[in-house]
Amino acid sequence: MAAESNDSQKAMNLGPTLRDEPPSTEEIEQRQRKASTSSSEDGEHEDNDRRRVVGSPGSRDGSPRVGSPVARASPRAKRDQKSSDSDSDSSDSDDGVMRKIRSSVMHIRRTSDEETKNRERSSSPDRHEKKSKSRSRSRSRSRSRSRSRSPRERYRRARRSRERERDRYGDRERYERRSSRERDWEHRRRGRSASPDKNDKPPTEEPPVKKRKETLDPILTRTGGAYIPPAKLRMMQAQITDKSSLEYQRMSWEALKKSINGLINKVNVSNIANIIQELLQENIVRGRGLLARSILQAQAASPIFTHVYSAVVAIINSKFPQIGELILKRLILNFRKGYRRNDKQQCLTASKFVGHLINQNVAHEVLCLEMLTLLLERPTDDSVEVAISFLKECGLKLTEVSPRGINAIFERLRNILHESEIDKRVQYMIEVMFAIRKDGFKDHPIIPEGLDLVEEEDQFTHMLPLEDEYNTEDILNVFKLDPNFLENEEKYKTIKREILDEGSSDSGDDAGGSGDDEDDDEEDEEAAAGEEQEKVTIFDQTEVNLVAFRRTIYLAIQSSLDFEECAHKLIKMDFPESQTKELCNMILDCCAQQRTYEKFFGLLAGRFCLLKKEYMESFEAIFQEQYETIHRLETNKLRNVARIFAHLLYTDSVPWSVLECVRMSEDTTTSSSRIFVKILFQELCAYMGLPKLNERLKDTTLQPFFEGLFPRDNPRNTRFAINFFTSIGLGGLTDELREHLKNAPKMIMTQNQEVESSDSSSSSSSSSDSSSSSGSSSESDSSESDSDSSSDSDSSSSSGSSSDSDSRRKKASGKKKDKSKSKKSSKAANQRSPLEERPTKRHENRRQDASKEDRRGSDKHNRDPQRRGQQDESPPARPRGEPERIRGQKEPHRHAQDHQDRPTDSGRHKDDGKNSRVNKDKDRRRSREKEPLRRSRDRSKSRERSRKEMDSRDSYGNGLERADKENRHSDRYKESRRKDDRRHR
């Protein structure tokens, strides 16, 4: 500011030289004197100023600061001298001087402005005070100087002073702003507490504060305190004996709040019935504020489930209308609050909930019309968007109950659209809304499927206008002590029983027998009525529905890009189960109609077979039907059908048991069926390869289903199958058939021998039974006679001779019977295979033979002691397991010895008869003992054959076993012939 005052003084000093005449010499001398006097005065003032300024914060070294009066005085005098010199030069160059003066003044102003800015940044409030004092002194000087000047100069000085004052006020305002910031900063700094010293000791009063916190009951706090586990909460409730106390009520309130919040958060379309039952188990009359708050919060958090929450409110409103009214009041107030605050999101959620409540008949449609009128009265982009979303939810309901009202709303929307005062996006939304109305709100039903749970007669509709004042009853959201807590709980329990029909079962049990009889009669009448209705069922024999069904399937197949899309379309048709087979037939017919086979149909059929078992069974039945009627198809259709079934078999979509209906023989096949089988197996070989196909056809679990395909019952059919598969290039599948055909004669012989052996075994079994009975009776008689003779040894010779003759006759007859019996038994034993003989019978026969031999040995011992030596000389019995060759060598030697030892008298003849009978018994026993050895030999042979033919095993591999049986029978037959020859010798 001081620099500006100096500039103004310079300008004023320069002023007379611009417009007045040039001064004379006398005037110049007077000015010099004045300048000297003023300089002396200024020097005195400067000394005083130096005394004041020394020691101030701005001058550390005692030198005069920039902008001080001392620094300003000398340049002022110099400028005055320069101006006087310029005035005394010449009067002709006024214009040039004027230009120079103006430029110098402008330069001085700029430099002065920069200097003032720098000084303002670095100066303090003390400097400003000193500057103001110096300015006042300079003003007084300038005033004393300006009194003698012209009015034009005064006017200029006044203008410059006004400019200076303006600049001064601006600087002061800047300083005041800066000082106010500094004061605020200092004030905040003073408000902060000083950081505690590290050495400070902790306060001694902290333990009592902690004790006070521990004494607080977390349950009695406003938020319920920390989380308490349910088990601990139940334990705490059980410990409280007074159920009406504050603590118990508070705990029950917390449990009620948690259960309501949990149930509301879990509800969806599928479990809404269960959630409502669990919700009614809680005292929602006491917690109606909690319930309303939970529903509104859940709906605001997830508006996509608004239809579910509206269904919950509708069910609760039908039982407790005051709860539905409370929720609707809070919704209306939320909408009004959001509308006043221009909160679009809150308006959207609230209006959507109100729209669904109108659809559920909880709120009246007048409320909807009022809200739409309010939104479209002064339309904006947001209000029109909210109105359109609201109309989408309840437009169909308004169309039914208030067509005039919704027509007025759409007229208003049309006017808004034509006025074009809204955004393009909102205009498109209005056009979409008209299109939705034209389609009949098909994507926005009144009540979604599965949520129409309340009858219209049971619902209570609330008539609540939009502009009324409502009480939201927020006090219900917080806990409050109930003096009649137990009574209210009992009242709610009775209400709950009535709602949930818990007492209906008890009342039904107390009813009399008459009621049961009446119920039975009613049920019988209903059943009879149902039967009559079933009798009246009309069947459409024109198959119009079948034709339409086939047409839809054909169009769906032809309009699909891939098989997955086609399967999805066909499944979504929801056709009845009776049409399952028709669908499979249609897929097969569409495949057969193609010029060439398309894999699309095979994949489609395979997908249906994997989806459901019914489709697989349908394709199995279709395979059999198609094979039986294959002669009706053309060659092209036949090829496509065979290839689609080959694909199903390769992918195991259809079991391989379907090949059971194929029988390869000259009589059971036609040219069409042979072509079908040829294409089928060639496709299978192309899909799987010959080794895998052969392995699948040799699977033991599937052999019963391949008997007709690879027949073994007749060599003619076997030869036909071999030739057929060889001709189509699949001869590798017939290796086992070829082996079977080679062994067929042997198997036929074994079969015939088995038939003969079975007949002979049946006859021999009957004869052996009769002979065994007669032999046992004769043996018993002989034993009795022997005992009698031994006991009566002292009797007379006459009685002894008679008894000897009787015994001889009996022995002769017994010998004949034994011969016939031994022949029959040897034949039966030779003809009967060791596997056919039962082990129990073998054991019984062995026991009987052993008992007979013991009896005979005892008879021989008692009758003739001389015979004992002959028996000792006879060869011993062959041990078990002795080879047949050794036995054959011993038997001729034994017969020769018998011929040498044969006596000539009658007694020796008797002994020879007995010896021959004993030898026959021994031979019989040896033949029976020989059978296990033969059996073990046959088993070892069969094991070796089974090892060799393990890989080529099939169901008809028993031909080798039959051949083994034949070999065994032939060996046995040869051995029996040898025995007979030896006996006859």
UniProtKB/Swiss-Prot annotation:
GO terms for molecular function: RNA binding. InterPro entries: ARM-type_fold, CWC22_splicing_factor, Initiation_fac_eIF4g_MI, MIF4G-like_typ-3. Residues 548-664 form the MI domain. Residues 257-440 form the MIF4G domain. Component of the pre-catalytic spliceosome B and the catalytic spliceosome C complexes. Component of the minor spliceosome, which splices U12-type introns. Its main location: nucleus. SUPFAM superfamilies: ARM repeat. This is Pre-mRNA-splicing factor CWC22 homolog. One of its GO terms (cellular component) is U2-type catalytic step 2 spliceosome. Residues 18-32, 110-129, 162-187, 195-209, 846-871, 879-954, 961-979 have a biased composition (Basic and acidic residues). Residues 86-95, 501-531, 781-791 have a biased composition (Acidic residues). One of its GO terms (biological process) is mRNA splicing, via spliceosome. Required for pre-mRNA splicing as component of the spliceosome. Promotes exon-junction complex (EJC) assembly. Residues 130-161, 808-826 have a biased composition (Basic residues).
